[in-house]
Amino acid sequence: MDARADQIYNPYRVFTRAQWAKLRDDTPMTLNATEIAALRSMYDRLDLKEVEEIYLPLSRLLSIYVAATQQLYFAQRRFLGIVDRKMPYIIGVAGSVAVGKSTTARVLQALLARWSPRPKVDLITTDGFLYSNAMLERQGMMQKKGFPESYDLPRLLAFLSDIKAGRRRVRAPIYSHLTYDIVPNEYVTVDRPDILIVEGVNVLQTGRLPRDGKAVPVVSDFFDFSVYIDADEPVLREWYVQRFLALRDTAFHDPRSYFHRYAPLSDEEATATALAIWERTNLANLEDNILPTRPRATLIMKKGTDHVVETVALRRL
């Protein structure tokens, strides 16, 4: 297929970093360097330039999408002749382990919350909907933690359904990255936000089509917009190893850490351990479950080796 044909049939418009940065237009910078540093994960890179050139154009785009969705909502309400609660706008953020999803989600939350008028913007991660370690151990699934089958999908779908229905004080379980497990009897409460950001590796996952033709909901059915954070596999592998080494020198030293046993490892031993975990679990999950969902995203941000976004692909309407 020649370049022109590929452009015609490509469902995305692809922008270079420079092209995308120009779409910021006059969107104001509402974060300072200190606030940006606080949003950044310890093993990620984010600076004022990245926010200006990548996230401010995305914030502007999202403001357009949210406004259009609100107009459509009110038009539908007039058509149906009903008075209904305003439904929150839900944004999904997907991508591999170590790609920087959490940083992206936090930056979006901070920027969107400073729109005028100030909307209520909440953020949850799907980690809280993982089955407990005890359950995964009983099912022999600890090696597949993070795979689609390791999540309590009915509970996650019920949560999103309640949010979309406008219910008050909907609770989501809390996950501890220190203990690598669900925190018993602790929850975060989501109370009718204007915008909800849902971050997780498999949020764009689809299920198998039922043979009986019955509708089977998936998480992304509840999304109004979705972002996939992308990077080449060798780059992701290197970032995962770097993160593992950084955690070995910090969080792993806490006796409560699930990975405390790795704290004494040498650089060589820690690197070998991280690579083994990547190959056994994260790479398999990426290739089998995460990467195949990339074409379902509304927008794809592709990162280079230095953690900065190099290209942005926006799905055509």
Curated annotation (Swiss-Prot):
Keyword Cytoplasm assigned: yes
UniProt: ATP binding residues: 95-102
One GO process term, biological-process aspect: coenzyme A biosynthetic process
InterPro entries according to UniProt: P-loop_NTPase, PanK, PRK/URK
GO cellular component terms, semicolon-separated: cytoplasm
Key words of the record: ATP-binding, Coenzyme A biosynthesis, Cytoplasm, Kinase, Nucleotide-binding, Transferase
Catalytic activities: (R)-pantothenate + ATP = (R)-4'-phosphopantothenate + ADP + H(+)
GO molecular function: ATP binding; pantothenate kinase activity
Enzyme class per UniProt: transferase
Keyword ATP-binding: yes
Location(s) in or outside the cell: Cytoplasm
Documented EC number(s): 2.7.1.33
Xref: Pfam families: PRK (PF00485)
Pathway noted in the entry: Cofactor biosynthesis; coenzyme A biosynthesis; CoA from (R)-pantothenate: step 1/5
Family of this protein: Belongs to the prokaryotic pantothenate kinase family.
PANTHER family for this protein: URIDINE KINASE (PTHR10285)
UniProt-recorded name of the protein: Pantothenate kinase
Organism listed in the record: Rhodopseudomonas palustris (strain BisB18)
